[in-house]
């Protein structure tokens, strides 16, 4: 078995491809089961699996079974998403072994994010791990890897300043609106969605002076809670056309699998604005739409409407590129922390080499203990239960004390890359089948 990663992110694939391979929350159980189950009678691709799917990345982490290749994973992605492999294979990256651990630790630390040091990825990594754990596709190796990666993210944020003042995708979207339109006071802002991205957008809009905020979401309770928290107006999802008609700025971030805003929606909104101005010869009204969702919420051809300016998450680079320079001074420290966590994982992995021999040694010791204990008890008559318990405890204590030094020695040797050598010596000394 081998640690394996196949993925794509904002550096290798545009949003048009990322959205095609994104896994929704409803997709995850089926996808993870297909990766780790053997319903067809053939061995599954992975013994363990976690899928990390966000607006900027889709990554499959796994412990492969013998015979699994990168092509098998490409074929899985193509079949699951019903897309020809040729349309996306050139955007994929593949890592094995140590490189997987290094990539995940850096990802959890925000070092591979579009917005350098952003904190949301930490929660997204945790959510991906917990979702796989609930489904039962996490074993000991991915459990340890993700726990160590989450520690890496936490340490980087606590031991460096990389996260201080770090933007989020939401903040970058608001900054884009501010740069394009200037003062946000008096602007009609429509937020579509009720999740974390929308909440962060609301926070940043208010911080930047926005004072006319409307929130629309399919789940009215979520929208109502956000609206109350930030002093916004809440509208039912069915009122989206009316909300668009009065909006100057639209920021959308739902989990819809297909667009919720099409060209005719925006065209009608622009026409309504034009009529309201009672100026048939004036330039068309402007509308700024920022689509932070993957898959996208807003159809791409909306951008063809005069007066409409449509941006996606990929367009945020112009806003956040300066953060790389601003935070490059602490990158070296962050990368050092990541490397320390990677080495901790690798050390743990090496200790796993010792487990088979240690298990056999413990089993052999138990066999001898049980044989000798039974022989002794047969020779001792009329023992009370308390006396038998004392002798039983004595035998266990002797075995544990005798096994502790070689066990500790082998684990330490394995942690330093000498596990196979010491395991072979131990197996020969104790006549173990190894």
Swiss-Prot record:
**InterPro entries in the record, alphabetically?**
4pyrrol_synth_GluRdtase, 4pyrrol_synth_GluRdtase_dimer, 4pyrrol_synth_GluRdtase_N, GluRdtase_dimer_dom_sf, GluRdtase_N_sf, NAD(P)-bd_dom_sf, Shikm_DH/Glu-tRNA_Rdtase
Q: Name one GO molecular function term.
A: NADP binding
Positions binding NADP(+) in this chain are 193-198
Enzyme class, UniProt record, top EC level: oxidoreductase
Name the active site residues.
55
User: Which regions form coiled coils?
Assistant: none
Q: Where does substrate bind?
A: 54-57, 113, 118-120, 124
Q: What is its EC number?
A: 1.2.1.70
Catalytic reactions of this protein: (S)-4-amino-5-oxopentanoate + tRNA(Glu) + NADP(+) = L-glutamyl-tRNA(Glu) + NADPH + H(+)
What is the role of the protein in this entry?
Answer: Catalyzes the NADPH-dependent reduction of glutamyl-tRNA(Glu) to glutamate 1-semialdehyde (GSA).
Q: What else is known?
A: During catalysis, the active site Cys acts as a nucleophile attacking the alpha-carbonyl group of tRNA-bound glutamate with the formation of a thioester intermediate between enzyme and glutamate, and the concomitant release of tRNA(Glu). The thioester intermediate is finally reduced by direct hydride transfer from NADPH, to form the product GSA.
The subunit field of the Swiss-Prot or TrEMBL record says:
Homodimer.
Q: Which family does it belong to?
A: Belongs to the glutamyl-tRNA reductase family.
Task: Tell me what this protein is called.
Answer: Glutamyl-tRNA reductase
